[in-house]
Amino acid sequence: MRSVISRIDLRGNPADPRASLPRAEIDVASAVEKVRPICEDVRHRGVEALIELGERFDGVRPAHIRVPADALETALAGLDRTVRAALEEAIRRARIVHRDQRRTDTTTRVVPGGTVTERWVPVDRVGLYVPGGRAVYPSSVVMNVVPAQEAGVPSLAVASPPQAEFGGLPHPTILAACALLGVDEVYAVGGAQAIAMFAYGAGECAPVSMVTGPGNIWVAAAKRLLKGIIGIDSEAGPTEIAILADDTANPAYVAADLISQAEHDVVAASVLVTPSTALADRVEAELARQVPAAKHRERITQALGGPQSGIVLVDDIDHGLDVVNAYAPEHLEVMTADAQSVAARVRNAGAIFIGDHSPVSLGDYCAGSNHVLPTGGVAVHSSGLSVQSFLRGIHVVEYDRAALAEVAHHVVALAEAEDLPAHGAAVTARIPREEQQA
């Protein structure tokens, strides 16, 4: 029987493995030109454009762009008790972790009379995007709102697509999650037009300084187009998991975790990296057993069978570490002997999950960690969403006259070396040359 997932044999191949591990191709650049007129329309026509675009793309003409307060209250009152308890626990754990990420101001005494203070200041206003479509993601509300709140952001707004099924409002579970978090500024706007609304402002929605949150290719394209007008977290691409495992790993767990990521999208990447052909065989057998029983088996089968997924055979764990560090996955699970020591050698990953009992799905919801993570290999230079994402470090410089006099001649020398004499003159106006220390 044909395996649901391909094998990639890198044994004996020390070359850069990235060419052998293709990712799904998402052409954000060409999408930018398609969202440009949408963003310009929102810029110039505001709410009128947003209502028309909602009808065009979401199949419903929302009666209100801003969700009324009573709709938030109604959604919370109607939330399933089990889901509410789970969301409250996810919020509680996320607050524990993100509260501990807060930065404190530090003052460094460079010389007597000369200090530099690093002051951490939250972004003034943030727009948080929560996608609709194939699935409902109240967890994305938690993961975006909690770090912003813990950073001290004074003004938060959430946007999520209007749903015809719910009378032009976002999904009630999204609204309930907002209510649980105390967010009362919510907009029934989706896609690129939501990012444009945040960037330019429209109606009751004042412009924001920063936009975070996942979305489809059109959301990513709008973020790219408007970056500079707004700060962004990232251009989220298809989700991905890599699992570094040896023959001590439980194949049923490995298969279940590969499937859980493939469940997201047909272009989701599920990659197992292992030196054990025996484990590879057992995982393939588990996939053959588990996939047919999955609710979204067609989507999962496409994702596992796509070129972005595979079982990668390597020489040993050291080689496997080279592979995963080059791949820089969004999520990395380590299921090996001495997994903590192996995980400590990983340099490039959005988040790392260690051992048999730390599946990615735990991190998606209730580990306390954040699930907004870098995709597409950008974990080589970028981090996941955190309190730090919403803070700016401002250097505050304070020197007295004596401290300036001590270094004035160096400032003047460097200014003259760079042919910027007015820079030096700004110092000599305060400290005449004869008073500058040589």
Swiss-Prot record:
Annotated residues for binding of substrate: T239, Q261, H264, H331, D364, E418, H423
> Which residues does the Swiss-Prot or TrEMBL record annotate as the active site?
E330 (proton acceptor), H331 (proton acceptor)
Q: Which cofactor does it need?
A: Zn(2+)
Gene Ontology terms, MF aspect: histidinol dehydrogenase activity; NAD binding; zinc ion binding
The EC designation for this entry is 1.1.1.23
- Family annotation (PROSITE patterns): HISOL_DEHYDROGENASE
Provide the binding site for NAD(+): Y129, Q193, N216
List the Gene3D superfamilies hit by this protein, alphabetically. 1.20.5.1300, Nitrogenase molybdenum iron protein domain
One GO cellular-component annotation of the UniProt record comes to:
cytosol
Please name the pathway: Amino-acid biosynthesis; L-histidine biosynthesis; L-histidine from 5-phospho-alpha-D-ribose 1-diphosphate: step 9/9
> What chemistry does it catalyse, as a reaction equation?
L-histidinol + 2 NAD(+) + H2O = L-histidine + 2 NADH + 3 H(+)
Keywords assigned: Amino-acid biosynthesis, Histidine biosynthesis, Metal-binding, NAD, Oxidoreductase, Zinc
Which BP terms does GO give this entry?
L-histidine biosynthetic process
Q: Name one Pfam family in it.
A: Histidinol_dh
Manganese in keyword set: no
Q: What class of enzyme is it?
A: oxidoreductase
Residues that, per the record, bind Zn(2+): Q261, H264, D364, H423
Entry cofactor note text? Binds 1 zinc ion per subunit.
NCBIfam families hit by this protein: hisD
**Role of this protein:** Catalyzes the sequential NAD-dependent oxidations of L-histidinol to L-histidinaldehyde and then to L-histidine.
Q: Spell out the family assignment given in the record's similarity comment.
A: Belongs to the histidinol dehydrogenase family.
The protein's name: Histidinol dehydrogenase
> What is the species listed in this Swiss-Prot or TrEMBL entry?
Thermobifida fusca (strain YX)
Lineage at the top is: Bacteria, Bacillati, Actinomycetota, Actinomycetes, Streptosporangiales
